[in-house]
């Protein structure tokens, strides 16, 4: 078993090192398998930003020399089996894209943004037997804008909300593989 800390390793190999139900909750944002890097960001092709026309995330990453392959396929069934094995509860972003058990407790993140060309909300499947949750938060710019390491990175405020909504503070063990 691994010591507490951060590990840069294949999550499948890492999860296999832990006993059943070791983590109190796993909060994950796996690839949805929708090829997000190659989606054009917006439908107005005459739009420009800093002299560049509207383009896909993949094009921007290639131009910056940071191109990486991700989101071409969803996680395997084995991934979800292992995730459920090592954690007592789960919060899975993009849960609407996966074949998961029925639940009444979804988390809906209302992005509070007006553009029809972008997703106005994101959905997380949870294993909790609680009412559905709604979190309204704009991360499109201004005071709430955060520097991102990854194009699909969720805002810190969203994770702070999850900690409060699911009473996750108090020294439990949390897993965030992917």
Name the predicted role of every residue range.
Residues 1-25:
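SAM-dependent nucleic-acid methyltransferase catalytic core
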Residues 17-28, 32-69, 73-75, 84-178:
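Class I S-adenosyl-L-methionine
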Residues 14, 78-79:
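Short acidic active-site motifs
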């Amino acid at each position: 078993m691994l010591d507490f800390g951060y590990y840069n390793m294949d999550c499948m190999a890492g999860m296999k090192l832990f006993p059943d139900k070791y983590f109190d909750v796993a909060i994950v944002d796996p690839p949805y398998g929708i090829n997000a890097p190659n989606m054009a960001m917006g439908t107005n092709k005459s739009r420009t930003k800093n002299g560049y026309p509207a383009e896909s995330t993949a094009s921007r990453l290639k131009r910056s020399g940071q191109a990486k392959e991700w989101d071409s396929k969803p996680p395997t069934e084995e991934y979800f089996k292992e995730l459920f094995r090592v954690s007592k509860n789960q919060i899975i972003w993009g849960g609407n894209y996966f074949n998961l058990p029925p639940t009444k407790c979804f988390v809906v993140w209302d992005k509070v943004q007006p553009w029809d060309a972008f997703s106005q909300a994101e959905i997380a499947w949870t294993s909790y037997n609680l009412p559905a949750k709604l979190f309204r938060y704009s991360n499109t710019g201004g005071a709430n804008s955060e520097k991102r390491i990854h194009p699909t990175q969720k805002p810190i405020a969203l994770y702070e909300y999850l900690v409060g909504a699911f009473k996750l503070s108090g020294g439990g063990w949390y897993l965030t593989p992917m």
